[in-house]
Design a protein with these regions (language model features):
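Active-site neighborhood of phospho(di)ester-bond hydrolases with catalytic His/Asp-centered motifs
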Residues: 1, 12-14, 59-63, 91-107, ...
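Conserved catalytic scaffold of divalent metal-dependent phosphoesterases
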Residues: 1-82
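Short amphipathic alpha-helical surface micro-motifs
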Residues: 8-10, 43-44, 100-103, 115-117
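Binuclear metal-dependent phosphoesterase catalytic core
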Residues: 19-22, 89-94, 106-136
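Glycine-centered flexibility sites
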Residues: 29-30, 83, 102, 123
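Intrinsically disordered, low-complexity regions enriched in small/polar residues
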Residues: 38, 49, 100-103, 134
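Short secondary-structure transition/capping segments
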Residues: 38-42, 103-112
């Protein structure tokens, strides 16, 4: 969300953690630079710093997926989108319970397990008409 769209009293959690219902959620917004020049692209180091800032969260919520090919390939656009190697490294290191993301509209795989972590494209609900419900 862009700053000019925020209402008074709203705060964007980007590179920050918050506790909800006894679980720690970490939020990382934006995407990595690409030839497509989409809004809010940042360089790999800046993105990695935001990922590091939410290390240890129970649930990571990001816009882009981790760098896992099955999660990056868009079957309609017929191309690989950019995913984050830093996010994948954090998943392997800290093993959060879930990583929730979007960005890839028609993914080859909607979800993939990396170690103990369930990585889920929750933005895919637009195609299914059913939102993802996180059940602990």
């Amino acid at each position: 969300m862009w700053a000019e769209h925020l209402r008074p009293g709203h705060h964007v959690l980007d590179g920050e953690q918050v506790e909800l219902g006894g679980r720690t959620f970490g939020f990382v917004g934006g995407g990595l630079r690409s030839p497509y020049r989409t809004p809010n692209e940042i360089d790999d180091d800046a993105y990695a710093a935001k990922v590091a800032a939410v290390s240890g969260a129970d649930v990571l919520c990001t816009h882009i997926p981790p760098a896992v090919p099955e999660l990056l390939y868009d079957t309609v656009a017929r191309r690989l989108e950019r995913g984050s190697a830093a996010l994948l490294a954090e998943i392997k290191r800290s093993q959060p319970r879930y990583v929730l993301f979007g960005h890839v509209h028609q993914p080859l795989a909607r979800r993939v397990r990396v170690g103990r972590t369930e990585c889920i494209n929750v933005g895919h609900f637009r195609a299914t008409g059913r939102p993802y419900v996180l059940a602990w």
